[in-house]
Amino acid sequence: MRVLFAGTPAVAVPSLDALVQAGFDVVAVLTRPDAPVGRKRVLTPSPVAARAAELGIEVIHAAKVDAEVTARIAAAAPDAAAIVAYGGLIPRAALDVPRHGWINLHFSLLPAWRGAAPVQRAVMAGDDITGAVTFLLEEGLDTGPVFGTLTESVRPDDTSGELLERLSHSGAALLAQTLSAIEAGRAVAVPQSGDVSLAPKLGIDDGRIDWHEPALAIGRRARGVTPEPGAWTTLDGQRVKLEPVALRTDAPALQPGQVLLDGKSVLVGTGSHPVELTRIQPSGKKMMAAADWARGQVALEGVVFE
C-alpha cells in the first residue's frame, strides 16, 4: 500500500520507521519547513525530514497545506496518509486525496485531551492512565472515529518527555497495525465516546510555578512542562529555570516561595507542604544541582521565589 507520512518532531520518527519496516511503500513525507535551532539559530531540517532523507524518501516541506502542496500530495498518489504531530491543519481538499483517508496517531485516549499537548496536559492533570489512539482524521479537532487504542500507565515521576518517548514507540506499532488492517479490509472505526477535554498548546506562562498552589499540583506542573516549555520561577525579578521537584511531606513548614537549605536538600514552601528542588538554572548560568546553587548564595535567609 502506498502511504504518505506527515510528521515533524522526533516523536514522529518511530512511526515513520515502523511503516518502512512493515513494508509499506512510503511515497513521500510531509513535514514543516527547516527551523532555526540553538543559540546560533542555524536553519535545521525537522527530525522527520532528516530521517526521510536518510531513507531516500521524497520530502515535501510545508508550513501550510495549500493548493500547491495538495497537488504535490496528489501527485504522490497515496492510498492512505499517516499523520503524527505534523503541526498544521489538513484541509478538506487534501483529506480527500487518499482513498483510505488520513490516519492520525494521537497520544491520548480520545475524546480526552483533544489538541496539541495531550501528554503534557495529562501529566499536569495527574492522570494515572493515558494512551494513544489511531483515528480517521476529519476537519474537526481530533473528532474522528477510532481504529485502535493502547493504554499506558503514568508513573509518579514521569515527565511529559519520558511518557511521550514511551508512547511514541508503542504508538508507532499501533499505527503500523492499523494501516495493515486497513490494507486487509478488516479495519473498523468506532465513533468516539466519553467526556471531552481539551489540550491546547503550552506556552511559556504554563511553566511558571505558583508557589501558593499545593505541592502536588506544583510537582505535576513541573513534570508536565519538562522538557518544554520548562518550569520556572523568578528571584529578584530574574527568571530561574527548574527541573522537576520532589515532594517532601516530612519537611518543616515554610511560607509559599520561601527557600531553606535543610542538610543537602533545598526546600521551597508551597500552599501545602514543601517541595525539594533537584536542579536549578539561574539567569545567565548553566543548569546545576540545587544544593550547589544554595551553597553559592551569600545567605538563603530571606530568599523567596516570586
Swiss-Prot record:
Cellular component (GO) terms are: cytosol
**Which positions does UniProt annotate for (6S)-5,6,7,8-tetrahydrofolate binding?**
108-111
Q: What is its EC number?
A: 2.1.2.9
Q: Which reaction does it catalyse?
A: L-methionyl-tRNA(fMet) + (6R)-10-formyltetrahydrofolate = N-formyl-L-methionyl-tRNA(fMet) + (6S)-5,6,7,8-tetrahydrofolate + H(+)
Keywords assigned by UniProt, alphabetized = Protein biosynthesis, Transferase
Identify the stretch annotated as signal peptide in this record: none
HAMAP family under this entry?
A: Formyl_trans
Biological function: Attaches a formyl group to the free amino group of methionyl-tRNA(fMet). The formyl group appears to play a dual role in the initiator identity of N-formylmethionyl-tRNA by promoting its recognition by IF2 and preventing the misappropriation of this tRNA by the elongation apparatus.
Which family does the record assign? Answer: Belongs to the Fmt family.
- List the PANTHER family hit by this protein, alphabetically: METHIONYL-TRNA FORMYLTRANSFERASE (PTHR11138), METHIONYL-TRNA FORMYLTRANSFERASE, MITOCHONDRIAL (PTHR11138:SF5)
User: What's the name of the protein?
Assistant: Methionyl-tRNA formyltransferase
Source organism of the structure = Arthrobacter sp. (strain FB24)
The record's gene field reads fmt
